[in-house]
Structure formats: C-alpha cells, structure tokens
Amino acid sequence: MRRLTDDWSNTPDASVGLITTTLGASRRSPAALLLIGFVSGALATLTFHQGIIWVLSALGALQGSAYSWRPVEPFGVPQVLNLAFWGGLWGCVFALIADRFPRSWPLWLAGLLFGAIAPTVVGWFVIAPLRGQPVAQGFEPARMWVGPVINGAYGLGTAVFYAILQRWAWAGSRW
C-alpha cells in the first residue's frame, strides 16, 4: 500500500490529489487494512506455518504434529484454529507496519524478517514465561532455531497472502 502522501504529491494541484485520496480512503480504510492483514495471517498459519511444521516433523527434526485438533485451554478450541486466530492478529500487526519497511526490500523479505523476529521474540520472552516454560527455549541452540524457522515461514506466507489480497482489494499496491 502506498503512503498517503504518495497518492497526491506528484499531482500539479495538491487539492485534486487530496480529493482523490479522500475518495479512495473508503477502500483503504484502517479497517480494510486490518481485515486484509488478519485474513493474510490466518491463511499463512494454515498453509506456511503448519506446512513447515509438517515438513520438519516428517524429516524428524521436530516432535509435534501439524494441523492438531487437540483442544486448547481455556475454551477448548482446536489448536489449529487457535493458531490461525493468533496468526490473524499477527497479520494485523504486519499490515500496520508493512509500509514502514524500506521500499528497496521486497515484501516477501519484510514478511520473512517480521515473522522470524517479532512472534519469536514475543514467544520466547512473554508467552513462554507465562506458561511456566524456560525463556528462549532455555537458550539451547538445538531448540532455539525452531521458532525463527517456523515463524519466518509464517511471515513469508503472510506477506504473500497480504500482497495477493491487497491487489485483489484495490489496485495500486506497492508490491
């Protein structure tokens, strides 16, 4: 998505650009941006995130199962749907900051780095202690690599779906 100023800064009459930007605002509203981010994140969880878990499990590099329907407390929601919900929320965060990455970066790279860093750091230093687990997987490299790999795949998928849905929703995406 282009920055607001990009829509009108190159027009000879700034007021014409401002009107165009205002008229287009309904399609580019924050709610629409968040919806695209949420759907992108949820779809990325169901495909890229769970897909890489399935591949790593099949290779024997990870103990766990993809697409688990095991109930998650406190509401008993199936794990895969719980993950898709949280992936959708992370997709909203990505949608809000996607335009802040350097313009020289491809969106897939921004998504990959976002996924590998943001959800992983929160998981290590916020979620794990709340669950009574060791911070950052106990700082054991043999266990630490899993988070950035799985979440990096998630971020890549979020960026892919974000670009597709953004183009579908409105023309003029920067990617």
For the regions a language model picked out, list residue spans one by one.
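Juxtamembrane/disordered regions of integral membrane proteins
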Residues: 2-175
